[in-house]
């Protein structure tokens, strides 16, 4: 089955990843709120949401789908292994529901073996294990038909600057990402249309080696041997807001460089830890979020919007772990539809008619909120 694209405004597909749906909502201060569910059950929830017309795609970390054993790095190649049986079941479910796979991501953050980094680990033996895990993820992505292989910075970062091997760390990172391209070409995997990088300023490490979208583009163009293969997927509002940057600026820059692959979507309080709030949820960010979609429409960009967030920990119901997850998906989709509707209202703002930038901004706000500008003008004059 092939599902009809969403194709509303700049959004071609709505993707809800396994890690968002399966999240049991543990945090550094407390244990999980919801019971963990197996990946097949997560796939079932995703497929049900697709059948309800809420989403068209999904994504995964390798560890979201199947366990990883560093003593058996090629279990996915064993036809009768538990790993392959689980992957076959998930593939059949996704195909039956017409859910495409946007991206395959290798988890290089969960296992303590990667506590000092994955592809940038100073220990060459750990870097080799990371490379093998990446190759396994690429194979799983090929099996499920993923369009992108993505690298997010995970634990490739530092806390102590003087402890970093600065002469080699970016070479190791380039070697790791170049090997992704080489492996895909060597295996003749045709499902992948590119690789992508997700930057993040900090967390889980104190500083990350690729902290912003600008760093990511510079690294791609300056260090990778096949820069046309690679793009960037920013997590907005979250990651850029952590560094007090503006999401509209980020998207404008990436589009100008032809490096915006797709978009990770959620909400964030600026300068805090990675909140990963659902879109539009929380005390701030409405204007910035809506203007993101205004910009995408204005510049003619079209692509996948992928949710990367989790439900608020306080609203998870331990007695209804499945229903809580379904409500979360619906809320994310509703928020996206709100953004698209509000952004469509401000695309008619005519900058030429306004004298100042403040007037342009106020006019855009009134249009976004469907406020009668003439009524506001009359109320502003004390007669």
Label each region the model flagged.
Residues 20-22, 62-66, 105-110, 153-157, ...:
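Active-site-proximal loop/turn and secondary-structure-junction residues that shape catalytic pockets
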Residues 100, 132-136, 299-302:
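Extended, charge-rich low-complexity interaction segments
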Residues 24-31, 65-82, 110-128, 155-168, ...:
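Surface-exposed, active-site-proximal loop segments in enzymatic domains
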Residues 106-117, 146-168, 190-207, 211:
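Active-site-proximal loop/short-helix segments
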Residues 3, 9-18, 44-68, 78, ...:
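Glycine-rich, aromatic-flanked loop segments that form ligand/cofactor-binding clefts
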Residues 90-93, 122-149, 169-188:
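An active-site-proximal structural segment forming one wall of the substrate-binding cleft
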Residues 1-54, 73, 139, 147, ...:
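Histidine-acidic metal/acid-base catalytic patches
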Residues 76-98, 173-176, 180-183, 291-295:
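Catalytic-core regions built around general acid/base machinery
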């Amino acid at each position: 089955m092939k599902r009809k694209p969403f194709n509303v405004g700049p959004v071609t597909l709505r993707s809800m990843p396994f890690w968002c749906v399966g999240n049991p909502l543990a945090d550094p201060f407390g244990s999980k709120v919801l019971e963990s569910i197996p990946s097949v059950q997560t796939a079932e929830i995703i497929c049900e949401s697709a059948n309800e017309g809420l989403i068209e795609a999904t994504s995964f970390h390798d560890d979201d789908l199947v366990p990883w054993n560093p003593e058996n790095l090629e279990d996915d190649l064993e036809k009768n292994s538990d790993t392959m049986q689980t992957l076959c079941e998930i593939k059949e479910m996704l195909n039956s529901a017409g859910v495409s796979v946007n991206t395959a991501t290798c988890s290089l953050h969960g296992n303590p073996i990667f506590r000092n980094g994955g592809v940038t680990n100073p220990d060459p033996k750990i870097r080799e294990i990371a490379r093998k895990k990446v190759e396994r993820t690429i194979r799983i992505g090929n099996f499920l038909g993923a369009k992108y292989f993505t690298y997010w910075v995970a634990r490739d970062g530092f806390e102590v600057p003087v402890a970093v091997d600065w002469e080699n760390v970016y070479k190791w990172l380039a070697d790791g990402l170049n090997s992704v391209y080489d492996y895909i070409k060597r295996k003749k995997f045709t499902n992948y249309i590119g690789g992508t990088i997700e930057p993040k300023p900090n967390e889980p490490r104190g500083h990350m080696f690729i902290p912003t979208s600008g760093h990511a583009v510079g690294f791609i163009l300056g260090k990778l041997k096949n820069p046309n293969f690679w793009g960037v997927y920013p997590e907005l509002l979250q990651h850029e807001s952590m560094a007090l940057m503006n999401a509209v600026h980020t998207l404008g820059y990436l589009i100008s460089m032809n490096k915006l692959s797709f978009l990770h979507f959620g909400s964030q309080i600026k300068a805090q830890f990675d909140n990963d709030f659902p879109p539009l949820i929380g005390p701030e960010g409405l204007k910035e979020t809506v203007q993101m979609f205004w910009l995408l429409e204005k510049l003619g960009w079209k692509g996948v919007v992928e949710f990367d967030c989790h439900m608020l920990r306080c609203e998870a119901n331990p007695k209804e772990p499945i229903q809580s997850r379904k409500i979360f998906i619906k809320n994310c989709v509703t928020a996206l539809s709100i953004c698209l509707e509000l952004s469509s209202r401000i695309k008619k703002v005519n900058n030429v008619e306004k004298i100042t930038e403040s007037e342009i901004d106020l006019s855009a706000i009134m249009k976004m909120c469907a406020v009668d500008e003439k009524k506001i003008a009359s109320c502003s004059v004390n007669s």
